[in-house]
């Protein structure tokens, strides 16, 4: 009988010891489920708020990157660009932007967008003659749906790329003949004759070349300005050897078969609010204009010059007397608490300042369409604002007034908050859904200074 009693006692002790462990484990799993459910609900609520926004109001409410986020976990582009075209745009990005992704300050041009389009349709019209240096005449169709109404053309270029870099031992003059064709017409409309533009360019192929740029701004500017969605052109590219200066070039053959179909480069200025406008940084705001009477050197006071001079002298004497009387007074009253006096000038330990927040676009699953930069540091402002906001924050007088109201009159009025005061732009190289490549500069993407407001 003693043995069963001992066994029963041992079993009860064991159950008592194990019971708290089971209780502790169950709440931990429950808390984890609650946290996960809360995170999912928060994310779903955020997405629902974004989806209910009208498309017409999105650009004013959401940042440029959130506009992309709104489009719904953006899928990879339907079409991938050519490797040579992508290599060219990466080279352009390095020339225009720093490693951190901000536009270089030494650039003086006014465009903030560069788009590269590959032809959506092409076919050869006539065979070429390699011995004569004539390439096959090519019909090209470019779709410009990605060009928005707020983007204005500065320059357009036909970009020829090579499979491998090539070089010639003698100078070569290349002539590009470009014919812009009208779209297909219905039977009711009368077709207009195509208009032709011929460009003469001389290239010195002494060095290795991977691409050739031909300026075609003149024929394309009216088409882009009228928002043509499709541009149909015929291109004929001919290179002539300089046989007078180099007789040995007479019997040599051109190796121009490596020249591929051209891409179309559009240098644009995006005038929207989200785009970075370099003109404002090159031309800072002017100071307020003076009064017309002040410009002419006249006094704004209705009195005569002598009376005005007397007023200034009397005011100067009063200022001197007030300063001397203030100097005679004791600096601090005897009953004044120095610790309380200096406390208002002390900055808090966690004072308002900039903090880094480095992320990579692969974390957001955006690296399938954002080519550069690979990492992004938007930075943010965090911390407490001091009672007496000094010049270091550049805060307005309104901030000090709000502090006084909060402490003396109404504590429900919030204290000044730590917020960004200045920003810098961000350069982004991205692949569009149609396979085109876009270099864009976005305004106010990186916080550079904090303030209390």
UniProtKB/Swiss-Prot annotation:
* Family matches, as InterPro entries: Cystine-knot_cytokine, Growth_differentiation_fac-9_C, TGF-b_C, TGF-beta-rel, TGFb_CS
The answer to whether UniProt assigns keyword DNA-binding to this entry is no
Location(s), subcellular: Secreted
Which Gene Ontology BP annotations are present?
negative regulation of cell growth; oocyte growth; positive regulation of cell population proliferation; regulation of progesterone secretion
SMART domains reported for this sequence: TGFB
User: What is the annotated signal peptide range for this record?
Assistant: 1-25
* Keywords from the named record: Cleavage on pair of basic residues, Cytokine, Disulfide bond, Glycoprotein, Growth factor, Phosphoprotein, Secreted, Signal
- List the residue ranges of the region (Disordered): 281-300
The coiled-coil segments of this chain are none
Give the free-text PTM comment from the record: Phosphorylated; phosphorylation is critical for GDF9 function.
Which residues does the record list as glycosylated?
106, 163, 236, 255, 269, 337
- What molecular function does GO assign, one term? growth factor activity
Q: Name the propeptide positions.
A: 26-318
Q: Which PROSITE patterns match?
A: TGF_BETA_1, TGF_BETA_2
This entry carries the following GO cellular component terms, namely: cytoplasm; extracellular space
The SS bond pairs are 352-418, 381-450, 385-452
Family, as annotated:
Belongs to the TGF-beta family.
User: Partners and quaternary state?
Assistant: Homodimer or heterodimer (Potential). But, in contrast to other members of this family, cannot be disulfide-linked.
Miscellaneous comment as given in the Swiss-Prot or TrEMBL entry: Ovarian physiology and fertility are controlled by endocrine and paracrine signals. These act in a species-dependent manner and determine the ovulation quota in different mammalian species. While humans, and mammals such as the cow or red deer, normally ovulate only one egg per cycle, other mammals such as mouse and pig can ovulate in excess of ten per cycle. The mechanisms that regulate the species-specific differences in the number of follicles that go onto ovulate during each reproductive cycle are poorly understood.
What the protein does comes down to: Required for ovarian folliculogenesis.
**Identification of the protein by name:** Growth/differentiation factor 9
Classification of source organism: Eukaryota, Metazoa, Chordata, Craniata, Vertebrata
């Amino acid at each position: 009988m003693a043995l069963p009693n001992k066994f029963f006692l041992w079993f009860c002790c064991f159950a008592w010891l194990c019971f708290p462990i089971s209780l502790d484990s169950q709440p931990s799993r429950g808390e984890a489920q609650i946290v996960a459910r809360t995170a999912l609900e928060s994310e779903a609520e955020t997405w629902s708020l974004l989806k209910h926004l009208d498309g017409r109001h999105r650009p004013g409410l959401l940042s440029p990157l959130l506009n992309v986020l709104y489009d719904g976990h953006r899928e990879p582009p339907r079409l991938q660009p050519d490797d040579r075209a992508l290599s060219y745009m990466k080279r352009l990005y390095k020339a225009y932007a720093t490693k951190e992704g901000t536009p270089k300050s030494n650039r003086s041009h006014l465009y903030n967008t560069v788009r590269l389009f590959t032809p959506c349709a092409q076919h050869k019209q006539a065979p070429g003659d390699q011995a004569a240096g004539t390439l096959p005449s090519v019909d090209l169709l470019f779709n410009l749906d990605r060009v928005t109404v707020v983007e204005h053309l500065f320059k357009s270029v036909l970009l020829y790329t090579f499979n491998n870099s090539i070089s010639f031992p003698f100078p070569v003059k290349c002539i590009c003949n470009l014919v812009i064709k009208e779209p297909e017409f219905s039977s009711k409309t009368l077709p207009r004759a195509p208009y032709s533009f011929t460009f003469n360019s001389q290239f010195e192929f002494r060095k290795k070349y991977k691409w050739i740029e031909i300026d075609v701004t003149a024929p394309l500017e009216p088409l882009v300005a009228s928002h043509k969605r499709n541009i149909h052109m015929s291109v004929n590219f001919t290179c002539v050897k300089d046989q007078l200066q180099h007789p040995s070039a007479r019997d040599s053959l051109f190796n121009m078969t490596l020249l591929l179909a051209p891409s179309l480069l559009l240098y644009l200025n995006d005038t929207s609010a989200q785009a970075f406008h370099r003109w404002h940084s090159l031309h800072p705001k002017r100071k307020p204009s003076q009064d017309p009477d002040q410009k002419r050197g006249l006094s704004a006071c209705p009195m005569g010059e002598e009376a005005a001079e007397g007023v200034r002298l009397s005011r100067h004497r009063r200022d001197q007397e007030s300063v001397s009387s203030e100097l005679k007074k004791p600096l601090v009253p005897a009953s004044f608490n120095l610790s309380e006096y200096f406390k208002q000038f002390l900055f808090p330990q966690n004072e308002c300042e900039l903090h880094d927040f480095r992320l990579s676009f692969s974390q957001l699953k955006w690296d399938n369409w954002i080519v550069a930069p690979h990492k992004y540091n938007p930075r943010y402002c965090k911390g407490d604002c001091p009672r007496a906001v000094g010049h270091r924050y550049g805060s307005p007088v309104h901030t000090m007034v709000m502090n006084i109201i909060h402490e003396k009159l109404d504590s429900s009025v919030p204290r000044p908050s730590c917020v960004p005061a200045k920003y810098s732009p961000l350069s982004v190289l991205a692949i569009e859904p149609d396979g085109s490549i876009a270099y864009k500069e976005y305004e106010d993407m990186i916080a550079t200074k904090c303030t209390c407001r």
